[in-house]
């Protein structure tokens, strides 16, 4: 009987690890797109301003280099505007954040399931049914999740393995709990 609980626990732990990684990758992909959006938006504003300054300057002077520079800056401004039309970075940020939030919910369900496995207050079959329900939701979520990049995977690796995101000391947890719930 204990062997059945162990087998189920191993499977749930494996799924839990996968969900932790998937959640962090989706978060990092959203961060990447948000950074790109901020950068492109800043460049767009700067190039639009410089284009206006260049055109106004042409009223007062007729220098060829100013015309060429204004045309180049205008081209960059048009390119960035076209890029924003082709790739809606804000929608991508939202899609990845949404997937990350759904994965967080699944992660919490798996954590609860691991606790129930350890308590052994339910039968293995009941726990396996709960696990199956979670897996079905997870399969749908993975099918609908937006694609991520290798860069997001690398950032997630750093966050989880180097910075130890999602790991808390007892002291950090105690700071956010009432005294009666502190671990001593």
Each PLM stretch: what is its role?
Residues 60-64, 87-88:
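Membrane-interface helix caps and helix-loop-helix hairpins in membrane proteins
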Residues 45-56, 72-82, 106:
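Hydrophobic alpha-helical transmembrane segments of multipass integral membrane proteins
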Residues 62-75:
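Hydrophobic alpha-helical transmembrane segments
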Residues 1-46, 83-184:
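Conserved non-transmembrane functional hotspots
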């Amino acid at each position: 009987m204990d062997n059945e609980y162990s087998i189920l626990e191993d499977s749930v732990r494996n799924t839990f690890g996968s969900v932790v990684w998937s959640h962090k990758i989706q978060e990092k992909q959203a961060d990447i797109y948000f950074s790109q959006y901020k950068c492109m938006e800043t460049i767009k504003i700067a190039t639009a301003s410089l284009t206006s300054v260049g055109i106004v300057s042409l009223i007062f002077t007729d220098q060829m280099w100013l015309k060429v520079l204004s045309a180049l800056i205008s081209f960059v401004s048009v390119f960035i505007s076209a890029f924003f039309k082709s790739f809606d970075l804000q929608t991508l940020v939202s899609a990845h954040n949404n997937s990350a939030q759904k994965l967080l919910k699944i992660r919490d369900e798996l954590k609860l399931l691991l606790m129930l496995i350890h308590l052994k207050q339910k039968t293995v079959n009941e726990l396996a049914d709960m696990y199956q329900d979670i897996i079905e939701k997870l399969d749908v979520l993975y099918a609908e999740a937006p694609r991520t990049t290798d860069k997001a995977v690398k950032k997630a690796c750093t966050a989880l393995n180097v910075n130890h995101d999602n790991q808390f000391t007892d002291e950090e947890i105690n700071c956010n709990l009432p005294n009666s719930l502190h671990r001593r």
